Amino acid sequence: MDYKQSNLFLFPIGLGSTYIFYKKICGTFCSIDNDLEVNPYLTHGILMLTLVYFLSDYYLMIVKYNPKHNVYFVHHFIGIVSIYFSYMKYYYLIKYLFAYLTFELSTPFLNIAIKYRNQGVYNKCSIFSELAFFILFTVVRIIFGTYLWFVTSNTLSSIEYPYNYLIVLPTILQFLNYWWYYRILKILRAKLFGCINKED
């Protein structure tokens, strides 16, 4: 889907998940007994919006297949499976799902930055978009994401067999974040010291 449609989903998903995380998960993050229901309409609404986003984008990626986007099939599949298991089978894990959904705070700024780059526009808005994306990606997906990976992996490893193998989901997702971050750093280096490779 195009960047405008994508951002219509991602802004409320990222902001809503951050609000839920801040209000009810912060401070009791490692407790499986904490009450998640900040507002049931908000929590279920964010979950439904996220599921609709993943499924619709998955469908569009199939219809408009581009081999460069194969990694997003993995990303969206992890999201869909995580929603199912955390909502239908292990509801106490849903706090981790909302923590992971805070990752989407960075994506709208990436979409905007790509739009400006494709149009060959370089102005204050494009600079702000790139800077906001880099900072948010670093803080949310790399620093917080690494911590979240360890916490989630520890919790998932204690689930009964065979569902303890769900540990592969946050592991794959975090390594995707590291791979994307490597590419981001390459682009940043090219911006500062040379030309950008169109493949990045």
Curated annotation (Swiss-Prot):
Protein name, UniProt field: Putative TLC domain-containing protein L438
UniProt-annotated location(s): Membrane
Swiss-Prot/TrEMBL keywords: Membrane, Transmembrane, Transmembrane helix
Keyword Membrane on entry: yes
Chloroplast listed as a keyword: no
Organism: Acanthamoeba polyphaga mimivirus
Residues of the TLC domain: 1-193
GO cellular component: membrane
GO BP term, example: lipid homeostasis
Membrane-topology descriptor: Multi-pass membrane protein
Record-linked SMART domains: TLC
TM spans (from-to): 9-29, 43-63, 74-94, 96-116, 131-151, 165-185
Record-linked Pfam families: TRAM_LAG1_CLN8
